């Protein structure tokens, strides 16, 4: 009975945080309303295509998203594994704390002083279960964002 209430409570929390629409909010904070780069960032986020676009704008955008949802501490840039695991669980996935802790350790060894959302995302991408579940969690969290084609009229080449 307790686990049913916990599941309900966690689902309620993630539904409440969905309303913020983090991708759109971070893009709005980082760019002017009609800035082409803003739409380009949103398109890349929509496609989960963050490679090859290593600009200060992309890093700032990704920092904003990870900090705003609580997956990274702004000051230390440390990954908040517990928060991400809780968000994944609230999104319907099994507890992935152990897997995310392993990914964090691997990431710390590989990237050392260059840790941030781009490196964390890259580490998640190279894990066994990480990419599919992480992307689905984001789709569940950012329903409004992913329900619209963010790449219409955008050329990524």
Swiss-Prot record:
InterPro entries, A to Z: PBP_GOBP_sf
Main location: secreted
GO cellular component: a single term: extracellular region
Summary of the function given for this chain in its UniProt record: Activates MyD88-dependent canonical NF-kappa-B signaling in host macrophages via interaction with host TLR1 and TLR4; this drives the expression of neutrophil chemoattractants, followed by the subsequent influx of neutrophils and recruitment of myeloid cells at the bite site. (Microbial infection) Promotes Zika virus infection in mouse model by facilitating recruitment of flavivirus-permissive myeloid cells at the bite site.
Subunit structure: Interacts with mouse TLR1; the interaction promotes activation of canonical NF-kappa-B signaling in host macrophages. Interacts with human TLR1. Interacts with mouse TLR4; the interaction promotes activation of canonical NF-kappa-B signaling in host macrophages. Interacts with human TLR4.
Keywords for this protein: Secreted, Signal
Protein species of origin: Aedes aegypti
Signal peptide annotation: 1-19
Gene3D superfamilies according to UniProt: Pheromone/general odorant binding protein domain (1.10.238.20)
Compartment annotation: Secreted
Designated name of the protein: Neutrophil recruitment protein
Disruption phenotype: RNAi-mediated knockdown results in reduced neutrophil infiltration of the host skin at the bite site.
């Amino acid at each position: 009975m307790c686990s049913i209430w916990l599941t309900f409570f966690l689902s309620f929390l993630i539904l409440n945080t969905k309303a913020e629409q983090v991708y759109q909010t971070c893009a709005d904070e980082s760019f002017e309303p009609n800035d082409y780069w803003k739409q380009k960032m949103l398109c890349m986020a929509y496609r989960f295509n963050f490679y090859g676009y290593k600009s200060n704008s992309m890093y700032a955008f990704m920092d904003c998203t990870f900090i705003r949802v609580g997956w990274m501490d702004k000051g230390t840039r440390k990954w908040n594994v517990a928060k991400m695991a809780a968000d994944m669980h609230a999104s319907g996935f099994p507890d992935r704390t152990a897997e995310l802790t392993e990914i964090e350790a691997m990431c710390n060894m590989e990237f050392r002083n260059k840790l941030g959302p781009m490196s964390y995302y890259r580490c998640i991408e190279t894990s066994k279960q990480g990419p599919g579940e992480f992307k689905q969690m984001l789709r569940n969290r950012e329903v409004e964002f992913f329900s619209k084609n963010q790449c219409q009229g955008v050329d990524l080449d």
